[in-house]
A protein has these predicted regions:
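Interfacial segments of alpha-helical transmembrane regions
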Residues: 44-72
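Membrane-helix interface segments
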Residues: 23, 38, 53-58, 122-129
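Transmembrane helix-loop junctions in multipass membrane proteins, especially transporters and channels
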Residues: 53, 81-86, 146, 150
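Membrane-embedded catalytic cores of phosphoryl/pyrophosphoryl-handling enzymes
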Residues: 92-150
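Alpha-helical transmembrane segments of multi-pass membrane proteins
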Residues: 65-74, 134-137, 141
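N-terminal transmembrane-helix/juxtamembrane module of multi-pass inner/ER membrane proteins
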Residues: 1-39, 73-101
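Hydrophobic, aromatic-rich transmembrane alpha-helices
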Residues: 41-52, 114-117, 128
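Residue-level signature of the transmembrane alpha-helical core
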Residues: 30, 46, 62, 131-135
């Protein structure tokens, strides 16, 4: 293995061996599920369109999500074609339904940080919780052994 992959697997195994617990096994999958298909982020953008005070933020969020979809899921994932860590390391039990697309970059994490970035620019009262959620989403993808830290 190359040094980057060795580092990635060491981090993922550290999480699995030292942080994993039944409490996180219960809450991490539902948090990660919120990012499936980007629906929670799309819903947030659409809801914002209904209110004059948040309409511009909703449009900006929607535009960011569309750009992220194009760059992340349609361009980078097939270009980089990085297999999932659970496919690389033997004997890894995954506690969610295994994704079948490539690992890099994480669509869940990309969308969460797109939303958080727009919201931080527009109103920190919403941006800070969105940023915390984005970091939580990134952690869930590592915890579930479906993405690499790099």
């Amino acid at each position: 293995m190359n040094p980057i992959v060795e580092f990635d697997i060491a981090v993922l195994n550290f999480i699995r061996e030292h942080i994993s617990c039944s409490f996180l096994d219960a809450i991490v999958p539902p948090i990660s599920f919120l990012g499936n298909g980007g629906w929670i982020f799309i819903l947030a953008a659409v809801i914002m369109l209904f209110f004059r005070s948040t309409r511009k933020t909703g449009l900006m969020t929607g535009a960011a999500l569309i750009c992220g979809l194009i760059v992340c899921n349609l361009a980078l994932k097939p270009l980089v074609a990085r297999i999932r860590p659970f496919d690389l390391v033997e004997g890894i039990d995954v506690i969610i339904k295994k994704p079948h697309d490539y690992s890099f970059p994480s669509g869940h994490t990309t969308a969460a940080f797109e939303l958080a970035t727009v919201w931080m620019m527009r109103d920190r009262r919403f941006g800070i919780p969105a940023l915390v959620f984005a970091f939580a989403m990134a952690f869930t993808r590592l915890y579930l052994y479906v993405h690499y830290p790099t």
